Swiss-Prot record:
GO terms for molecular function: S-adenosylmethionine-dependent methyltransferase activity. Pfam families: CheR, CheR_N, TPR_19. Disruption phenotype: Mutants show a dramatic reduction in biofilm formation. Involved in biofilm formation. Keywords: Methyltransferase, S-adenosyl-L-methionine, TPR repeat, Transferase. One of its GO terms (biological process) is methylation. TPR repeats lie at residues 355-388. Its EC number is 2.1.1.-. The keyword Transferase applies. Monomer. The TPR repeat does not mediate self-association. Residues 1-263 form the CheR-type methyltransferase domain. This is Probable biofilm formation methyltransferase WspC.
Length: 424
């Protein structure tokens, strides 16, 4: 096919496995750039691409569509706060903590790292955050640090009041947070990256490996390993754990944190704090209360229709369901996976099916490495609530990790549409 040379170019330059995002999406980007560059056809555009570094970058920008928000996977930031205090004590003032967000996209993740550590009581001189991305436009937007509604998701948005000023065009991040983060353009496939940047105590590289083929995954992992201090912690995406397990890393053992350390016997990774005593960097996201779905229950769990109940009973039932959902979130965020799972089952036995409960069951199974159970639960969540944002994102990542790239792509497109609609 005429497009194959462009696919090879993207693989060589940024490691992209085109099938992971879908050939049609890349083909649309090619058509857009052909028009923008004034090329007569793909052959003409190929010649222009070879002769212009600016056009090469423009094509990469057209293909990359950032999807991120503040405090995505909040349990990772809770774990970071506890681990960072331990690591800082080990350093005993020798140097500040070093953290890396790669890719940093439009800045939500590296700024979340800084806010989490501030919330954990750390002074500005105690840590430094680096953010790197291959996209100059994303890095430029991160530098502006002005964000719209889509960057703030979930119901726990207290950090926005603490660290942002409201503007007509969105919310601007406080200078205090911005000064903690250094941003730059860079490529994770750059072989000089590790030697140039030294070692990091914490590296956040989430939902990147799943877009690469196996050889590129290995190359990227070797770079990450060189960047990471022997006692450091690598935070990844939910569906990438099996990849790291094959590459000599092991989970740290903090539920839903997706934190991994080296499996080598000569390293002494940070011990995970007991979940019940871990100091939180911020209040973790409670389970949102979603509208009750109008699907029939199995006969064994049939409940009295809401319309037939007295008003007081309906009110009491709603409050009980909300309290149970909040309790599930607290247990899961505290790492009490078995108790959280038990409470999910209790909810399903007492109340109508809930997309959020099935999402929690999926995430618990995902964290424990049970991919098939996770798939089943995520799909049930989406049956009940087709636009459930977290279920869409997690199921897409899981399908991509299993090689179902077409299915993952469809879910990614649904998630992107849902995100756009939420901004209207």
């Amino acid at each position: 096919m005429n497009e194959q040379r462009f696919f090879r170019f993207l693989r060589e330059r940024i490691g992209l496995d085109v099938e992971s995002v879908g050939a049609p999406m890349v083909e649309r980007a090619l058509r857009q750039r052909c028009v923008a560059a004034g090329a007569m056809d793909l052959d003409d555009y190929w010649l222009r691409l070879q002769q212009s570094a600016d056009e090469q970058q423009a094509l990469i920008e057209a293909v990359i569509v950032p999807e991120t928000w503040f405090f995505r996977y909040p349990e990772s930031f809770t774990a970071l706060a506890s681990l960072a205090h331990k690591r800082l004590a080990q350093l005993a003032g020798a140097r500040p903590l070093r953290l890396l967000s790669l890719p940093c996209s439009t800045g939500e993740e590296p700024y979340s790292l800084a806010m989490a550590l501030f919330d954990a009581g750390m002074a500005p001189g105690a840590f430094l955050v680096d953010g790197m991305d291959i996209s100059p436009s994303s890095v430029a937007k991160a530098g502006q640090a002005v964000y719209g509604r889509n960057a703030f998701r979930g119901s726990e948005l207290g950090f926005r009041e603490r660290y942002f000023d409201a503007l007509d065009e969105g919310h601007r991040l406080h200078e205090r947070v911005r000064q903690q983060v250094s941003l730059r353009v860079g490529n994770v496939l750059d072989p000089a990256l590790a030697s140039r940047d030294g070692l990091y105590d914490f590296v956040f590289c989430r939902n990147l490996l799943i877009y690469f083929d196996v050889p590129t995954q290995q190359r990227v992992f070797e770079v990450l390993k060189r960047l990471l201090h022997p006692q450091g912690v690598l935070f990844i995406g939910p569906a990438e754990g099996s990849l790291l397990a094959r590459m000599g890393m092991r989970p740290l053992g903090i539920a839903q944190s997706f934190a991994y350390v080296r499996h080598e016997g000569d390293s002494a990774p940070l011990a995970a704090a007991p979940a019940q005593t871990a100091k939180r960097a911020f209040t973790t996201l409670p389970a949102p209360v979603y509208p009750q779905p109008s699907v029939p229950l199995p006969r064994s769990r049939r409940v009295l229709p809401v319309a037939a109940r007295p008003a007081r009973a309906r009110e009491h039932s709603h409050e009980g369901a909300s309290e149970l959902l909040a309790g599930i979130a607290r247990l899961a965020n505290a790492g009490a996976s078995e108790q959280a799972r038990s409470e999910c089952q209790r909810y399903l036995s007492q109340y109508p099916p809930s997309a959020q409960v099935y999402y929690w069951l999926g995430l618990l199974s995902d964290t424990e490495g049970d991919a098939q159970q996770a798939l089943s639960h995520y799909r049930k969540a989406l049956y009940l609530e087709p636009q459930h944002p977290e279920a869409l994102v997690h199921l897409a990542a899981l399908l991509a990790a299993q090689g179902d790239l077409a299915g993952a792509r469809r879910l990614q497109e649904r998630a992107a549409r849902a995100g756009r609609e939420s901004e209207r």
